[in-house]
Structure formats: structure tokens, C-alpha cells
């Protein structure tokens, strides 16, 4: 089970909650927890790795689910600009703005340039069952599934 359960939690000090915006840059959302995704479903994400040297036009991502692996714990996705080291933990949204997962792997083989996206619903269930209270916070910005707009907006 832990092979596909690469997950970290961030605890926000109550005094700092007003300073944090859970919206995904460029796309908005999440609008809530999304259900399981299927092969061919659209996905949206935003990565901000320092390896991109500040080039924010490479940060918004749109792609497709290629397959589901690990008994549903993860899905393999392809995006036009794949997630790279430093993007780990980036949220992935479905085409309605539902949060479906977090980027956990960059693949070299068997599907070079693909990313492993761990199933967020399962990760949250696992954390809660383990005694660690965890929940998704919805974004404050409306979800817009428009990668060109996300790029044009500079991320």
C-alpha cells in the first residue's frame, strides 16, 4: 500500500490561515474532492519547480490519464510539460475542478516523461484511518480548465 501512498501534510498555524490561498495557480479550484479518474480523462496541474529557473509559462499543465496502477492508488498521466523534480506534491484536478491527486513520481520507464499521481481520496482516507486528521480545503478562486489562459496569465 505504501508504494503508492507518497503523501505529506502541511499544518497551518491558525494565526496564518488567512494568509494561505488553497487555489491552484492559473486554474483556480479545487472545488472539492474528485472521484476516481479513468483512462483518457483530462487533468490539470501547476508545478513550480526551481529547475524551471522562474519560467512560469512552463508551470501550468494539462494532460490525460494514461492508466491506473497499484489497485487504484495511483494513476499514470501525461502532460504537455511533465512534472519534474521539485514539482512533487503538486495537486492534480479533473475537468470539473475536483482534486484527484498529488504528483509523486517522474517516470523514465516504462512510459518516459509520464508522472505518477497518487489518488488523493485514498491518501486522505489512509491518513484519517492512521489517526492523522486530514481534509481538503477548497480553493477560493473559481476553476477554469483553460491551460492557454493559465499560461497567458503568467501562472
Model feature map: region roles:
Residues 1-69, 94-95:
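Serine endopeptidase catalytic core focused on the charge-relay Asp
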Residues 3-5, 72, 85, 113:
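Short, solvent-exposed coil/turn segments
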Residues 6-8, 74-77:
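Short beta-strand micro-motifs in enzyme catalytic cores
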Residues 11-16, 78-84:
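A structural micro-motif recognizing beta-strand termini
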Residues 14-29, 100, 104-155:
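C-terminal cap/linker of serine protease catalytic domains
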Residues 50-51, 83-84, 105-109:
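Short Gly/Pro-enriched loop/turn and capping motifs at secondary-structure junctions
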Residues 71-75, 90:
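Structured core of small recognition/catalytic domains
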Residues 81-104:
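Catalytic nucleophile loop of clan PA
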Amino acid at each position: 500500500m505504501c508504494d503508492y501512498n507518497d503523501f505529506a501534510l502541511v499544518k497551518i498555524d491558525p494565526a496564518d490561515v488567512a494568509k494561505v490561498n488553497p487555489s491552484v495557480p492559473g486554474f483556480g479550484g479545487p472545488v472539492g474532492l474528485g472521484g476516481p479518474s479513468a483512462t483518457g480523462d483530462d487533468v490539470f496541474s501547476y508545478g513550480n519547480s526551481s529547475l524551471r529557473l522562474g519560467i512560469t509559462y512552463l508551470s501550468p499543465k494539462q494532460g490525460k490519464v494514461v492508466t491506473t496502477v497499484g489497485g487504484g492508488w495511483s494513476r499514470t498521466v501525461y502532460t504537455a510539460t511533465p512534472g519534474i523534480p521539485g514539482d512533487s506534491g503538486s495537486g492534480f484536478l479533473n475537468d470539473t475542478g475536483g482534486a484527484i491527486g498529488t504528483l509523486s513520481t517522474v517516470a523514465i520507464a516504462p512510459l518516459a516523461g509520464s508522472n505518477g499521481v497518487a489518488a488523493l481520496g485514498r491518501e486522505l482516507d489512509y491518513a484519517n484511518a492512521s489517526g492523522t486528521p486530514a481534509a481538503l480545503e477548497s480553493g477560493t478562486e473559481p476553476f477554469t480548465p483553460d491551460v492557454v489562459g493559465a499560461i497567458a496569465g503568467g501562472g
